Amino acid sequence: LFDAVRSDFLRYGYGGYAVEQKSDGAFVGFTGFHNFSFDVDFAPGIEIAWRLKQEYWNRGYATEAAKACLDYAKENLPFTTVWAFTALPNKPSQRVMQKIGMEFEKNFMHPSVTDGHPLKEHVLYKSLL
């Protein structure tokens, strides 16, 4: 994982940023940007994503970190559109997308998920920087 994050920073100047707990510096997870390209009508693009340790879910870390990433991108990064997507059942992640001001675009069937799988259907959100 470290090599992939490092590679994105070297290639694009952005990637996943470590999220730490303010009180003690404990590692919470990652939030940041990822280039994506798969067979959908909104690709290629830049995704904002968050991956946190489960013990830190539902405590505001993803929202705070994602807002900080979007603010940073507006001033410092070379793109103007950011996407976020998640499986339809992942309501907590959808709430983060809404809280950081992203707009719902549509539902779509993720081409990398097997047909018939319960996580095949995804929701797509968009933010213009």
Residue ranges and their predicted role:
Residues L1-G13:
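Active-site rim helix/loop that mediates acceptor-substrate recognition in acyltransferases
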Residues A18-L129:
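Acyl-donor (CoA/ACP) binding surface of acyl/acetyltransferases
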